[in-house]
Amino acid sequence: MTIINHTLGFPRVGLRRELKKAQESYWAGNSTREELLAVGRELRARHWDQQKQAGIDLLPVGDFAWYDHVLTTSLLLGNVPQRHQNNDGSVDIDTLFRIGRGRAPTGEPAAAAEMTKWFNTNYHYMVPEFVKGQQFKLTWTQLLEEVDEALALGHKVKPVLLGPITYLWLGKVKGEQFDRLSLLNDILPVYQQVLAELAKRGIEWVQIDEPALVLELPQAWLNAYKPAYDALQGQVKLLLTTYFEGVTPNLDTITALPVQGLHVDLVHGKDDVAELHKRLPSDWLLSAGLINGRNVWRADLTEKYAQIKDIVGKRDLWVASSCSLLHSPIDLSVETRLDAEVKSWFAFALQKCHELALLRDALNSGDTAALAEWSAPIQARRHSTRVHNPAVEKRLAAITAQDSQRANVYEVRAEAQRARFKLPAWPTTTIGSFPQTTEIRTLRLDFKKGNLDANNYRTGIAEHIKQAIVEQERLGLDVLVHGEAERNDMVEYFGEHLDGFVFTQNGWVQSYGSRCVKPPIVIGDVSRPAPITVEWAKYAQSLTDKPVKGMLTGPVTILCWSFPREDVSRETIAKQIALALRDEVADLEAAGIGIIQIDEPALREGLPLRRSDWDAYLQWGVEAFRINAAVAKDDTQIHTHMCYCEFNDIMDSIAALDADVITIETSRSDMELLESFEEFDYPNEIGPGVYDIHSPNVPSVEWIEALLKKAAKRIPAERLWVNPDCGLKTRGWPETRAALANMVQAAQNLRRG
């Protein structure tokens, strides 16, 4: 019973973000489709080879995607919304891009599909759309082509396929309502066809991802697994793959399935290995997800070995990453600016492959010397002064209930704010960022590289802020922003100015499509050595008589969009960040900034996957926000922003944030999200996003007016704000000006009645 290792997937963007650059070049019309496809082939070949060189036995194929893997699955099944279809019914890569972006180099523009978070990660997928009587057929053979590529290169491969029930679970019904689970029998023949094609190619194992099995699924969905997998059995061996949580609550459903193996996440789940071994059929393979695919920390391999060693030799066993390595940066070895001590604490995707090789070798030989050597830096870290700050720990321990309460209730504050700002009905604003032009990015890069001194850099940034203020005044917006020219990323910027964080040069991970983020890493206790945003906010406010919002990223979002420490709770990290940013709110207020936005787009995505675990998380998440904001005076208006969210199940907590104004992303869901606020009778002010900033399409005045009228049927007009869905950082100035001009015009039309 020789143990082998495998990964569930590998980062696809490339070490230098080659995929992003190729996509954006193609979208802009600067390269051909053939050139784009060639970059994909080159990256796949490189990544398979890198994994093999790092000691991986069985390589994942089908984990590559041109936008996201759920969208790839939609195309595989022929699930293309009517508005995105080619006239001749064919499907090509531009079809895929139209679903993701709303437009592509060919075909007519049409509203992009809805985008949402992949379980509780920072990765996104395009939500599959289902209509009554829908037909499915094998349409997009990317998976089969990539398997052929890998086999031609001589690799031992394991195709990766998103399972049918998880796929249906992730989608939404459009038009006439029906139970989307009823489509299961319609999509299974396509899965059967794909598995038959893989069998023809001599494939032994297929990784079929069913992460929905870690959720608290309705009984009807659990019941659907047995007949579905009865239909899929027999052509190849199926490794039923779960991740992000444990499977014990649904183990009875799982063990009844006609599959040949089960992958479990032993990092994020609480499954007991001995219990799993006892309950799984004896002829099943167990794939043990021991190496964290979602973080950057070096694994304590001695501990991982102890976790699994008792079942070695008792059943077929593979060792693996907990989930796809998609969520981790690619290679630590190219990081030249991290000091040796801190660098020794980390492992990126390729190093995690090496960890899997070390673990496999030790489990096969019984020799653990290499594991102890690998794990030594982890022991040293526990006592490092880089990690522990007694002053922060003391301040955290001294928090009282009073620290999370504003001085007065919303009604009292709203009156003070109305008297101070005298805003018109339907006040217009934006979410914070303006287009990050090539000039802005070059300016920041030159400064970072030392090619530009601090004075010239500051002059340049001041000029861009001035331009943003001039543009907004010209457009007639009511509440302005400084545009965030100095910020590369809403989380990275704050991390760079807080103690307790470190940064990488090339630690990119994919968020969606071509968007990549470089998350900060929380290595120790968090504190604020000096004001962060005050100087630029104060400068922007000096340029105009209109209020300029101070812009902060909230504590839960900084936590969720960073790689967190693993030695303290997420609650502890969030509250440390909240205390640091509380001081920033006080300093902004003292500098004359009267409106302060604390963005919490990640509040909902941080929810545990199981509803039974929600309350504890929401309690400390809300408390962290309130600690951050509660220092503000009555006439200081606190805004918050949230995106990609479904709120109906957490409305109590949204209201408990007690922000004076909340702006939300609603345009892609056609104001659907406002139902939650209406039913809950949300007491404070709200700005439902009136156009989708993820698409370059410019909305008409009529379209925006119609959305606002729809919103006013649910929320009293006197409590409505008018704003885009999200920040405008990724857009160009021409479409930004056009869209905002239409938005302001729509608000003015409504004021006139």
Curated annotation (Swiss-Prot):
A molecular function (GO) term: zinc ion binding
Enzyme Commission number(s) from the entry: 2.1.1.14
Location of the active site: H694 (proton donor)
Metabolic or biological pathway: Amino-acid biosynthesis; L-methionine biosynthesis via de novo pathway; L-methionine from L-homocysteine (MetE route): step 1/1
Entry annotated with the keyword Phosphoprotein: no
Binding positions (Zn(2+)): H641, C643, E665, C726
Entry-linked InterPro entries: Cbl-indep_Met_Synth_N (IPR013215), Cobalamin-indep_Met_synthase (IPR006276), Met_Synth_C/arc (IPR002629), UROD/MetE-like_sf (IPR038071)
Residues annotated for 5-methyltetrahydropteroyltri-L-glutamate binding in this entry: R17, E18, L19, K20, K117, R515, C516, W561, E605
Signal peptide: none
NCBIfam families with a match to the protein in the record: met_syn_B12ind, PRK05222.1
Role noted for this protein: Catalyzes the transfer of a methyl group from 5-methyltetrahydrofolate to homocysteine resulting in methionine formation.
Family recorded in the similarity comment: Belongs to the vitamin-B12 independent methionine synthase family.
Record's protein name: 5-methyltetrahydropteroyltriglutamate--homocysteine methyltransferase
Organism of origin: Escherichia coli O1:K1 / APEC
Designated gene of the protein: metE
